Amino acid sequence: MSLTRRIPLPAFAGATVVLFTIAISMIFFYAPDDPNQGLSQRIFYFHVPIALTAYASFGWGAWKALLHLWKRSETADLESYVAIHQGVIFGSLTLLTGSIWAKISWGTWWVWGDDELVLFLVLFLFYCAYFMLRYSVEPGMARANMCAVYALFGVVLIPISFLAIRISRSIIHPEVFTLNGPQMTGSQFLTFCVAFVAMLSLFVTLYQTELAGKRIDSRIKELRELIA
């Protein structure tokens, strides 16, 4: 991730704060109310960017897993782990915000007949199981290889989950983006874009923060082994 290595972490954190301030202001003071859902529709500007960021996190984790298998890189293995960890966090927030939105708008927390919901849950649980695999095997190249293969298998679920909304024609998940363009007003689309960029910036900030922490922890362990 060469771009993030060139930009200091505090700069990313500062940009994230600024972007979120702008996004929240636009969500509550710029974007118009939905005629059918009213104020509750504003959850959309949080829920969908969070979900897309979760997809991006899992995808980035799979890409780093592929790089590990190709180059046998411990760094790529660590980056894959951190990306998937962030994906699980954003996945949890996706399920939480989606359930709240569904309860307010449609009177139910969950609909098992909705393909998008169920497939995202399967994707989420699949990557949760990644950590069960990782912590059940001794650290080393064998564990890194197994986790990388597992992460790559999971990436197949991402387009299936993403495209489910276009296949199922769900009422709970109306199709917002079509071949004819976004099905929203200009101000709504601009607000959505700013919120999405803010969420991606948050992911990069958390990703780099966790990576830095893991690297420091690894160096401390190496020093302890040398001293011992």
Language model: regions and residue ranges:
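Polytopic transmembrane helical bundles with strong interfacial aromatic enrichment
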Residues: 1-228
